[in-house]
């Protein structure tokens, strides 16, 4: 039996998580195994109840489970709190306390939605790649950092173990995905830290002789992702470059409501849609649950090692979309849109009994 901690959070978080949990219930019923779900408050919802965005009880529950499912955090109600009490600080803390060092962001275009992309349909059709972004090092955390009246400074630094563990994760994923290709993204032509990154990735690659490794400069990668996204399978890169490239890749799909993510550590993992809490549509039952449901698909693949069930969920999403179901964010002008609940029910219907 697996144990999931559900932290729905704020805004549309509870609505999209409810849809994802309904999918989990259908999967366990269909395949005859059990998943225990334990819900805890997080973010603004937790602050309103307990005066803390992340209570010790919630954190301990997240430590004592197989996977964490997060909805969304934040909203205007809590924007004026001190930085250390803001929802974003709680999210950084939970990632740090769980030892999450890799962010996984898939860029998958469903056939039924090729026309929703801002790129031409023939460019994006068949796109299916994964960005592995290192989360704990690089310029976001390097010291020294600061600014005065005359200058500002930051330090981009990577330790050997930080590069090794993210590279190893990417190579292992490439082996499982079948095409066995990894593209390492850096700026080794001008940055010494990128030269170090490249050397370490190539050193780790010696343990994976069946995987093809290529290198690409980050500026070229940004261009290639929108020019020919199908050329990529697994991308591995540092914190700053990954932050930028994963957002570029994400827009290929046509809506933030389609984009799942996973943050992975040696023991723990947290799964969440990349969209925000969208307080303007919260409680209206119109949010797109697909990103959260696709995050559950990632959970089955990476935490539970059930790639077949992950594929089932993606196929059910594709089936619902092919049927013509669209929430408002992915509906074409004049096209009828469905509710959060209706989209969830459509996906469950395509999962089968």
From Swiss-Prot:
Cofactor(s) needed by this chain: Mg(2+); Mn(2+)
SUPFAM superfamilies reported for this sequence: Isocitrate/Isopropylmalate dehydrogenase-like
GO MF terms held by the record: 3-isopropylmalate dehydrogenase activity; magnesium ion binding; NAD binding
Location(s), subcellular: Cytoplasm
Manganese is among the record's keywords: yes
Main localization of the protein described in the UniProt heading: cytoplasm
Site positions (Important for catalysis): 140, 187
Catalytic activity: (2R,3S)-3-isopropylmalate + NAD(+) = 4-methyl-2-oxopentanoate + CO2 + NADH
Pathway(s) of this molecule: Amino-acid biosynthesis; L-leucine biosynthesis; L-leucine from 3-methyl-2-oxobutanoate: step 3/4
Positions that bind Mg(2+): 219, 243, 247
SMART domains xrefs: Iso_dh
GO cellular component: cytosol
A UniProt-annotated Pfam family: Iso_dh
Key words, A-Z: Amino-acid biosynthesis, Branched-chain amino acid biosynthesis, Cytoplasm, Leucine biosynthesis, Magnesium, Manganese, Metal-binding, NAD, Oxidoreductase
Residue positions binding NAD(+): 75-88, 276-288
InterPro entries named in the record: IsoCit/isopropylmalate_DH_CS, IsoPropMal-DH-like_dom, Isopropylmalate_DH
Residue sites binding substrate per the record: 95, 105, 133, 219
EC number: 1.1.1.85
GO BP terms, alphabetized: L-leucine biosynthetic process
Assembly and oligomerization: Homodimer.
NCBIfam families found in the cross-reference section: leuB
Function: Catalyzes the oxidation of 3-carboxy-2-hydroxy-4-methylpentanoate (3-isopropylmalate) to 3-carboxy-4-methyl-2-oxopentanoate. The product decarboxylates to 4-methyl-2 oxopentanoate.
Entry similarity comment: Belongs to the isocitrate and isopropylmalate dehydrogenases family. LeuB type 1 subfamily.
Protein's recorded name: 3-isopropylmalate dehydrogenase
Organism expressing this protein natively: Chlorobium luteolum (strain DSM 273 / BCRC 81028 / 2530) (Pelodictyon luteolum)
């Amino acid at each position: 039996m697996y144990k999931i901690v559900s932290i729905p959070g704020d805004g549309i978080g509870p609505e999209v998580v409810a849809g994802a949990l309904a999918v989990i219930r259908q999967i366990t019923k269909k395949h005859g195994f059990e998943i225990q779900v334990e819900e805890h408050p997080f973010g603004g919802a937790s602050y309103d109840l307990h005066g803390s965005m992340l209570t010790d009880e919630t954190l301990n529950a997240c430590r004592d489970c197989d996977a964490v499912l997060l909805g969304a955090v934040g909203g205007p109600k809590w924007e004026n709190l001190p930085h250390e009490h803001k929802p974003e600080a709680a999210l950084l803390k939970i990632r740090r306390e769980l030892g999450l060092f890799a962010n996984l962001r898939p860029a998958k275009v469903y056939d039924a939605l090729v026309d929703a992309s801002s790129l031409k349909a023939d460019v994006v059709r068949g796109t299916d790649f994964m960005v592995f972004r290192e989360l704990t090092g690089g310029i976001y955390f390097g010291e020294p950092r600061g600014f005065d009246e005359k200058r500002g400074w930051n330090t981009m630094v990577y330790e050997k173990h930080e590069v090794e563990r993210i590279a190893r994760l990417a190579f292992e994923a490439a082996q499982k995905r079948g095409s066995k290709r990894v593209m390492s993204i850096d700026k080794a032509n001008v940055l010494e830290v990128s030269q170090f990154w490249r050397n370490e990735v190539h050193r780790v690659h010696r343990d994976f002789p069946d995987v093809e490794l290529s290198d690409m400069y980050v500026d070229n990668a940004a261009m290639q992702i929108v020019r020919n996204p199908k050329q990529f399978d697994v991308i591995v890169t540092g914190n700053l470059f990954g932050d930028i490239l994963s957002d570029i890749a994400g827009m290929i799909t046509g809506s933030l409501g389609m984009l799942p993510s996973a943050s992975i550590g040696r023991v723990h993992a947290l799964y969440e849609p990349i969209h925000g809490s969208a307080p303007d549509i919260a409680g209206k039952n119109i949010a797109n649950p697909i990103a959260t449901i696709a995050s559950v698909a990632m959970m089955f693949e990476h935490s539970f090692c059930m790639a077949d069930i992950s594929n089932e969920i993606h196929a059910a999403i594709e089936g619902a979309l092919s049927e013509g179901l669209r929430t408002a964010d992915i509906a074409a002008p004049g096209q009828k849109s469905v509710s959060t609940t209706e989209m969830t029910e459509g996906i469950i219907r395509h999962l089968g009994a």
